[in-house]
C-alpha cells in the first residue's frame, strides 16, 4: 500500500475534518483520480511519434494509455474527425497513490527553474490541473532514448466542493504551491 494513502487515512482526514468542521469522515475531500494527457499534434505526419508518446506515458503511469482521436475536423490544423492525435491515462486506486507520491517527491522537484506550482490552477470545483513541459522529469523515462521532448497535462480530480477545500487537501500532502 502506498505511503501517502496511509498518511491520508491516518492524518489528513482528521486535519481536514477539524479545519472545515465536517460532521462525517465521508465529507472530507479525497483524491478520486489522476488523469495524464499527452497531445501529439505532429502525429498527423509521423505515426511513429504517437507510438513513442504511448510508450512514454505507459512508462510514466504503469498502465497502457488510450489513444485519443479528434472529435471533429479542423481545416486550419489539417485534422479530420477520427484521426489519432494523442493519448491519455486515468489512474485510480493504488496506482494513483503511487503516481501521486512519485509526482510530489521525485518528478516535480526535477522541473527546471522550479519555484512552486501555481495555486490558481484550480477549476472552481476543487480539481487541480498542471502542465509539464518535459516528460524527462520522470525517472522512468531514459533521457538517452527520448526521440523528442514532449509535455503532458496532469489533472488531479478530487471530491472537494470548492477550490479552498481542494487546495487544503493537496497542501496537506506538502504539494509544492508557490508562496
From Swiss-Prot:
Entry keywords, A to Z: Ribonucleoprotein, Ribosomal protein, RNA-binding, rRNA-binding, tRNA-binding
GO cellular component: ribonucleoprotein complex; ribosome
Signal peptide coordinates: none
One of the GO biological process terms: translation
GO MF annotations in UniProt: rRNA binding; structural constituent of ribosome; tRNA binding
Superkingdom of this protein's organism: Bacteria
Plastid is among the record's keywords: no
Listed InterPro entries: Ribosomal_uL5, Ribosomal_uL5_bac-type, Ribosomal_uL5_C, Ribosomal_uL5_CS, Ribosomal_uL5_dom_sf, Ribosomal_uL5_N
Keyword Transferase: no
Function: This is one of the proteins that bind and probably mediate the attachment of the 5S RNA into the large ribosomal subunit, where it forms part of the central protuberance. In the 70S ribosome it contacts protein S13 of the 30S subunit (bridge B1b), connecting the 2 subunits; this bridge is implicated in subunit movement. Contacts the P site tRNA; the 5S rRNA and some of its associated proteins might help stabilize positioning of ribosome-bound tRNAs.
NCBIfam families in alphabetical order: PRK00010.1
Entry's family note: Belongs to the universal ribosomal protein uL5 family.
PANTHER family with a match to the protein in the record: 60S RIBOSOMAL PROTEIN L11-RELATED
Subunit structure: Part of the 50S ribosomal subunit; part of the 5S rRNA/L5/L18/L25 subcomplex. Contacts the 5S rRNA and the P site tRNA. Forms a bridge to the 30S subunit in the 70S ribosome.
Protein name per UniProt: Large ribosomal subunit protein uL5
Gene: rplE
Amino acid at each position: 500500500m502506498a505511503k501517502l494513502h496511509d498518511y491520508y487515512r491516518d492524518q489528513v482526514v482528521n486535519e481536514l475534518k477539524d479545519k472545515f468542521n465536517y460532521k462525517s469522515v465521508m465529507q472530507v475531500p479525497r483524491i478520486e483520480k489522476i488523469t495524464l494527457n499527452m497531445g501529439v499534434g505532429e502525429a498527423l505526419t509521423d505515426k511513429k511519434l504517437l507510438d513513442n508518446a504511448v510508450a512514454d506515458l505507459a512508462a510514466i503511469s504503469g498502465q497502457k494509455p488510450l489513444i485519443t482521436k479528434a472529435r471533429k475536423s479542423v481545416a486550419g490544423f489539417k485534422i479530420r474527425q477520427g484521426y489519432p492525435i494523442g493519448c491519455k491515462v486515468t489512474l485510480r486506486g493504488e496506482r494513483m497513490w503511487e503516481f501521486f507520491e512519485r509526482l510530489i517527491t521525485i518528478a516535480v522537484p526535477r522541473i527546471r527553474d522550479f519555484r512552486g506550482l501555481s495555486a490558481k490552477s484550480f477549476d472552481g470545483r476543487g480539481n487541480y490541473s498542471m502542465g509539464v513541459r518535459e516528460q524527462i522529469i520522470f525517472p522512468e523515462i531514459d533521457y538517452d532514448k527520448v526521440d523528442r521532448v514532449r509535455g503532458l497535462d496532469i489533472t488531479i480530480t478530487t471530491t472537494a466542493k470548492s477550490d479552498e477545500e481542494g487546495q487544503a487537501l493537496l497542501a496537506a500532502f506538502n504539494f509544492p504551491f508557490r508562496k
